[in-house]
Amino acid sequence: VEAFGGTGVPVAWGELYNALQTGVVDGAENNPPSVRSVKFYEVTKVLVLNEHARIPDILIASKRVMDRLTPAQRAAIFQAGREAEAYMRGAWAADEKASLAFLKSLPDFKVIENVDKKPFLEKVAALLDREAKRLGVEEEVKYLLDTQKNF
């Protein structure tokens, strides 16, 4: 948040609606289904679709844990992951489409699409590099960034 000139303010999910309504915070990151389901559109006026997060969330397991599993256990986890992925992608796409249609239909709410993401990526590049080095996960971060190019 600081990279974009803001100050991050931790707010519990259950308190976010009121925090937005009273001006304790002036923005929040959420996806269209969440904005619709908890009625954030009542207390905010704009949703920017900058695709800064991957929804449904990705699943990551440590190599150390996976190496302790039997081949059959690993196969079961990967199979369950593939099945869950197929289901969730379909369910998420349908919910997101319906939520966006709803939000776009509101007269006092604006959905901004087709955002130029390059400036966002440039702003967070140094932070991402610094934190990856600090945590010793440069290769993992590179892998995730390369993987996300396929979506």
At which residue positions do the language-model features occur?
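N-terminal secretory/targeting leader peptides
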Residues: 1-151
